[in-house]
């Protein structure tokens, strides 16, 4: 009877891990945040190249979208703690029509902004993509030309 119990518990553990039991099931090297998985990629890409890279990883994966202060804080900590010297990092916010109408690449609601003072400033009418600003500890955002090369954060929902 004891051996049966051990085997049964072992099979239950395997089943739960494979079936996505309640909890955070982000892959190794990804972090969990409010029901999504995030990973910073150190490769420097344009905003569009980064978005296409994220989309190719997994259905529903995009550059990260942030919807509250806690989202910004978690990602700022992650970038600062694990990727010192990464510089600016692309997130999924962009002004696709160049009319100062900001939208997330995953099409979630644009209900939260964390602009650095004086931003967005659209220098030379060419800053249509967004990154957390390194000098702010990645807590405040800056608009920048989409052709700039930066590391980036991909995100998908659990």
Swiss-Prot record:
Motif (Mannose-binding): 119-121
MF GO annotations: carbohydrate binding; metal ion binding; toxin activity
Domain C-type lectin: 33-155
UniProt cross-references to SMART domains, sorted A to Z: CLECT
Tissue specificity comment: Expressed by the venom gland.
Endpoints of the signal sequence: 1-23
SUPFAM superfamilies for this protein: C-type lectin-like
Binding positions (Ca(2+)): 127, 142-143
Disulfide feature: 26-37, 54-154, 129-146
UniProt main location, coarse: secreted
UniProt key word Signal: yes
One Gene Ontology term, aspect cellular component: extracellular region
Subcellular compartments: Secreted
Superkingdom of the source species: Eukaryota
Keyword ATP-binding part of the UniProt annotation: no
Alphabetic keyword roster: Calcium, Disulfide bond, Hemagglutinin, Lectin, Metal-binding, Secreted, Signal, Toxin
InterPro entries, alphabetized: C-type_lectin-like, C-type_lectin-like/link_sf, C-type_lectin/snaclec_domain, C-type_lectin_CS, CTDL_fold
Family: Belongs to the true venom lectin family.
Functional note: Mannose-binding lectin which recognizes specific carbohydrate structures and agglutinates a variety of animal cells by binding to cell-surface glycoproteins and glycolipids. May be a calcium-dependent lectin.
Entry protein name: C-type lectin lectoxin-Enh7
Organism per entry: Pseudoferania polylepis
């Amino acid at each position: 009877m004891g051996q049966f119990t051990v085997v049964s518990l072992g099979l239950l553990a395997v089943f739960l891990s494979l079936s996505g039991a309640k909890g955070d099931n982000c892959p190794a090297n990804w972090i969990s945040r409010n029901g999504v998985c995030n990973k910073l990629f150190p490769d420097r890409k344009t905003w569009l190249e980064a978005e296409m890279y994220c989309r190719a990883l997994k259905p529903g994966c995009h550059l990260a979208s942030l919807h509250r202060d806690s989202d910004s804080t978690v990602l700022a900590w992650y970038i600062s703690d694990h990727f010192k010297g990464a510089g600016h990092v692309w997130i999924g916010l962009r002004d696709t029509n160049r009319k100062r109408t900001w939208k997330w690449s995953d099409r979630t609601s644009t209900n939260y902004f964390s602009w650095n003072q004086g931003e967005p400033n659209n220098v030379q009418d060419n800053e249509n993509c967004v990154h957390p600003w390194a000098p702010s500890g990645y807590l405040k955002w800056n608009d920048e030309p989409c052709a700039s090369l930066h590391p980036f954060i991909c995100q998908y929902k659990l």
